[in-house]
């Protein structure tokens, strides 16, 4: 049991946080957040961060560790998460990694590829091409060269589009080839519990309801407070988080309220689609339909079975 790490993964709005808090009442878990949005301070409503009450009942590591103007990489996440896993196990507890940033899960479990360093000449060429042809054109080019990577990133995520094309031009190999290649893996046994709603319409409705709830709770005001406190720019990594970019554009006068709402919901649904694409191909994952009544009971039973078998062996 010393090397056992549980991972609760799933698309946005699938019920991960509530289930994680429930699991802490049954097992000696300590939660590590696997969410590239929740790392940011002052970004609470739009990231669906656990409430103060939930965090009191179930503290989460790797929440509120960066300012919105800072960046945080998959490599930094791996360093932090592996250090926390070692500390948790040393205390006699079990790490429970919870979130939907699948790139972080992938890097942690499969190891990080040694990618080529940034090349200013290639980046300048790509930026010039983007100016003349548009980022949509470059995204379509990436879709042809590396459809696996293109399916995992947003069509407006210019930073990741540029990096994926840069890797291809520098090496002749796709980014997805690097990520799936043989790397040094951490010495842990990962149990992957995946929330995978079978009906996309159910998840889409939950996403719309949650986005409307965020707006009612003061999402727009949260973004205004960020602008007042920090030199917020739309190209910051923190502003790639769904909802924030759309509200920034609304506040800048580019969208009216209803257009912002529609685009925010659409962007969140696209995020869920990419997360489900990752999960669909996740080898060895145990899948649970979170729209089914009693799915949490099934997960609790499975965890208990795994722990009992680990102790007996």
From Swiss-Prot:
Enzyme class: transferase
GO molecular function: ATP binding; tRNA dimethylallyltransferase activity
Keyword Cytoplasm in record: no
Enzyme Commission no: 2.5.1.75
Presence of keyword tRNA processing: yes
Stored InterPro entries: Dimethylallyltransferase, IPT, P-loop_NTPase
Matching HAMAP family: IPP_trans
PANTHER family recorded: TRNA DIMETHYLALLYLTRANSFERASE (PTHR11088:SF60)
Function, as annotated: Catalyzes the transfer of a dimethylallyl group onto the adenine at position 37 in tRNAs that read codons beginning with uridine, leading to the formation of N6-(dimethylallyl)adenosine (i(6)A).
The name this protein goes by in its record: tRNA dimethylallyltransferase
The gene coding this protein: miaA
